[in-house]
Amino acid sequence: MSSYANHQALAGLTLGKSTDYRDTYDASLLQGVPRSLNRDPLGLKADNLPFHGTDIWTLYELSWLNAKGLPQVAVGHVELEYTSVNLIESKSFKLYLNSFNQTRFNNWDEVRQTLERDLSTCAQGKVSVALYRLDELEGQPIGHFNGTCIDDQDITIDNYEFTTDYLENATSGEKVVEETLVSHLLKSNCLITHQPDWGSIQIQYRGRQIDREKLLRYLVSFRHHNEFHEQCVERIFNDLLRFCQPEKLSVYARYTRRGGLDINPWRSNSDFVPSTTRLVRQ
């Protein structure tokens, strides 16, 4: 369990509690979680972070009424900057989106601007929002992570408790390699409810070669670990940077959706550009 699981900053969250579902607009439903809760124990300081990146959200259950009362539906794409003070707590995001359901807006741009304003206020950081009509996305192919999948290894695993021990001496040789490794076996658990979070992860790096068995064992050790998606990605980035010391590193995870939302955080210290196409489990 994370050291800050019972932190007072989490006490007021609706996550894990019985809640009422409102269908008229209410920005106060949004709740933020300080990024510092995870970053402080990792020694990460807001003014000297070793990465950049965003939290990419896809909104699949977004609906409101137009000025004449006709329901509208859209798929939303949200990007929250890594520099924001808070991350957005996902259940509160779902409840907030539900509050649009019986609310009239004059046009689509008013909806987009409202989302952008409220999310920016909650996160205390930069947020961008794009809305897509369904016919704009119909026929969009299922994406995949480019890279070499490390999952099909004939190894025995009997420990599922998080540890960085597997990354000790995980690099070999002096030759510098540049490769992209992929695993679909990432599974962690919600910090509050301990419900499972399922994801695929892409690790792109340049440096001494990382032992794939040790890397896979490390990733599997998240199986009983309780943290939010964004926190897991930053922990993985920080651990790889610390133990493997690559010249360049990018870590990108795409998680399956829950409550009509999926969260896809990435962190990088290079010119990494994430693919935003949904994966087969999304």
From Swiss-Prot:
Gene name in the database record: queF
Native source species: Escherichia coli O45:K1 (strain S88 / ExPEC)
Family under the similarity heading: Belongs to the GTP cyclohydrolase I family. QueF type 2 subfamily.
Pathway: tRNA modification; tRNA-queuosine biosynthesis
Top-level taxonomy: Bacteria, Pseudomonadati, Pseudomonadota, Gammaproteobacteria, Enterobacterales
Residues the record marks as active site: 190 (thioimide intermediate), 197 (proton donor)
Listed name of the protein: NADPH-dependent 7-cyano-7-deazaguanine reductase
Quaternary context: Homodimer.
Catalysed reactions listed for this entry: 7-aminomethyl-7-carbaguanine + 2 NADP(+) = 7-cyano-7-deazaguanine + 2 NADPH + 3 H(+)
Binding positions (NADPH): 90-91, 258-259
